[in-house]
Design a protein with these regions (language model features):
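The substrate-binding groove and active-site-proximal loops of carbohydrate-active enzymes
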Residues: 1-10, 27-36, 84-94, 126-137, ...
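Conserved, mostly hydrophobic/aromatic
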Residues: 13, 20, 31, 57, ...
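Substrate-binding cleft of secreted/luminal carbohydrate-active enzymes
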Residues: 145-166
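Active-site-proximal helices and loops of the catalytic beta/alpha 8
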Residues: 22, 32-117, 147, 164-190, ...
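Carbohydrate-binding surface patches
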Residues: 211-234
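Loop/turn elements at helix/coil->beta-strand transitions in domains of secreted/extracellular proteins
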Residues: 26-27, 52-55, 153-154
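Amphipathic alpha-helical
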Residues: 184-205
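Short, acidic/polar
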Residues: 5-23, 139-145
Length: 234
């Protein structure tokens, strides 16, 4: 374990992060298990980095992990773990859309309006340990993927999803991703085009997110609005 009481160690770690921004103009950092480092360290790091460039800081954590809001609000974006687990439960028919509505409302309440949640159906942990999206979502793969574009926040496409990969990639091993399944490439391309072309799907504090119909557990009717632009998810 690192001793974060050692200020010299903290400064050397921040120096290393500054190096890649100054010398290689990288756009930001993903902080793996961000809650394993004290919020004070991240505040110091992010303050110094943003004096160089407005880097994007992504925390692999959420407000329900250690550090809570104090930690997460230091970052521009964090993982929507609670939303992801909700999608998994719905796919397994353990939960329903009422539970998803509850999760959306909790997130709106628990995160400040300027924070970005990263929505996902897969990532390196889930793919390796819990299974591919086809293992977990079955025939609903595309529906749940589209939902990550519609929920408040930013969608994540994990390695291989754009080619419909059914491989559980191993940590620290070389795995090749076959770039053959154009169906999923075109699917994600279309989702991204829809997101780019519709202002209601952009990230903004002024986005209005509305649940229009909660009369059934199995059909959802959602609406996003911004600057006169409306988009619906059914």
């Amino acid at each position: 374990d690192l001793n974060f009481d050692n200020i010299d160690m903290q400064n050397r770690m921040i120096d290393a992060m500054e190096y890649w921004v100054k010398e290689h103009d990288i756009d930001g950092y993903r902080a793996d298990a961000a809650h394993s480092c004290p919020p004070g360290f991240w505040k110091k790091s992010i303050d110094r980095l943003k004096k160089i460039k407005n880097v994007l800081m992504l925390a692999e954590s959420d407000v329900y992990h250690p550090g809570g809001s104090e930690l997460i609000e230091l970052f521009d974006m964090s993982y929507n773990w609670s939303g992801h687990h909700e999608l998994n439960k719905i796919a397994k028919k353990e939960n329903n859309l009422f539970d998803l509505y509850g999760n959306i409302n909790r997130n709106i309440k628990d995160y400040n309006s300027g924070h970005i949640l990263m929505n996902f159906t897969s990532n390196h942990d889930e793919n390796t340990w819990a299974g591919t999206v086809f293992d977990r979502y079955g025939d609903g793969v595309k529906t749940f993927a589209a939902l990550t574009y519609f929920l408040p926040g930013m969608p994540l496409i994990y390695n291989g999803q754009e080619y419909g990969s059914k491989t559980r990639l191993e940590f620290f091993e070389k795995d090749s991703i076959e770039k053959k399944n154009k169906e999923y490439f075109e699917f994600y391309k279309k989702l991204s085009e829809i997101r780019k072309e519709n202002k209601a799907l952009h990230i903004s504090k002024e986005i209005e997110f509305e649940i229009l119909d909660i009369s059934t557990k199995n059909t959802t009717f959602l609406k996003r609005t911004f600057d006169g632009d409306d988009i619906y998810f059914i």
